[in-house]
A protein has these predicted regions:
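Short beta-strand->alpha-helix linker/helix-N-cap micro-motif
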Residues: 111, 115, 134-157
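Surface-exposed short loop/turn segments
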Residues: 124-125, 133, 149-229, 233-244, ...
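C-terminal/domain-edge helix-coil "capping" segments
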Residues: 1-64, 68-104, 204-297
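Short, intrinsically disordered/low-complexity patches at protein termini
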Residues: 110, 117-119, 181, 252-254
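N-terminal post-signal-peptidase region of extra-cytosolic proteins
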Residues: 96, 137-143, 198-203
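Short linear motifs at secondary-structure transitions and domain/linker junctions
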Residues: 32-35, 84-89, 130-136, 186-196
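Start-of-domain marker
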Residues: 1-6, 116-132, 149
Length: 297
């Protein structure tokens, strides 16, 4: 039964007929179910007929939504046209209307280039790599001009404030070790007995830490009134640390871990290691900020 005035009545009918046909196939392939329901009913002909009407129904809904000329209505139109094309592939101009609705629904953001900055850091790949919301698209100024975009919604810019690396900070701690080690044997009443000697050592453990800090500024501006929508500093700190040791006394008193520590020399990170790690963390934080901000669109 299809209600005369129900919203999307044919779309609902498609869903119901598909459920009936699924149940029909389940029964048809189950001997036990066939004993209970020997003549299951299928609705394939009805489904074909109602799909055509559902395509028309959702296509017209898409047209009406698109005529309202808002981003949110264009989004809805996009889904309506997709439904129409699913019900009847290639229905009228459904494919073209899907593209038009998506274009109308898309927030168009022009990425403004940054000035020459520290080590030519470039965060544009992170911005252009954003894909968490299909209704947000970023353009270079050249692309916006070539495409003759009638309306730009926002401008976005990432400014590199700089990178600083602190002086190495070295801390130390000293601890004592002692042990009893076998140094020989003696015969006591005809029995070999080990001779133990107490040994001791002091271990000094040195830890070197170097911290790098990078900072960028994310600015998003409304293209219509040039008001700043977002102006945020994004900061990343990255710390490198390593340890080595020295000892005084008898090495035999040291644990295996302490011995390995004493075999190391004072460490130094690779020249750009901390900087590269800091840059990678800035990439991650910028990506997260974009994902969070544009999720509302």
């Amino acid at each position: 039964q299809i209600a005369a005035n129900a919203n999307f009545k044919y779309k609902t009918a498609v869903e119901n007929y598909e459920k009936i046909n699924h149940l029909y196939e389940e029964i048809r392939t189950s001997p036990g179910a066939l004993r209970v329901i020997p003549k299951p009913v299928a609705k394939y002909d009805e489904l074909t007929e109602v799909k055509a009407k559902a395509a028309e129904e959702t296509y017209e809904a898409g047209i009406q939504a698109l005529l309202k000329n808002t981003r949110e209505d264009a989004k809805q139109a996009y889904y309506y046209f997709n439904d129409a094309n699913t019900f009847s592939p290639g229905y009228r101009e459904a494919i073209e209307m899907i593209e038009q609705a998506k274009f109308n629904a898309t927030l168009k953001v022009v990425v403004q280039p940054s000035l020459i900055n520290y080590r030519d850091w470039n965060f544009e790949p992170i911005v252009f790599g954003y894909n968490a919301n299909m209704f947000v698209k970023f353009y270079t100024p050249q692309q916006a001009e070539e495409l003759k975009l009638e309306k730009v919604d926002q401008y976005i810019k990432v400014i590199v404030n700089g990178y600083q690396e602190g002086r190495p900070i070295i801390t130390s701690k000293t601890e004592s070790f002692s042990d009893s080690v076998k140094t020989g044997e003696k015969i006591v009443k005809g029995v070999k007995t080990p001779i133990h000697t107490k040994v001791s050592a002091t271990l000094t453990t040195y830890t070197k830490k170097i911290t790098g800090r990078g900072s960028i500024n994310l600015i998003i501006t409304d293209a219509g009134n040039r008001a700043e929508i977002k102006n945020q500093d994004i900061i990343a700190d990255e710390t490198w640390s390593d340890s080595w040791g020295t000892y005084k006394g008898d090495e035999r008193a040291l644990s295996d871990g302490a011995k390995r520590l004493c075999q190391k020399k004072e460490p130094y990170p690779e020249r750009t290691y901390i900087e590269n790690r800091t840059r990678k963390e800035l990439d991650n934080r910028l990506s997260n900020e974009l994902r969070s901000f544009y999720s509302r669109y």
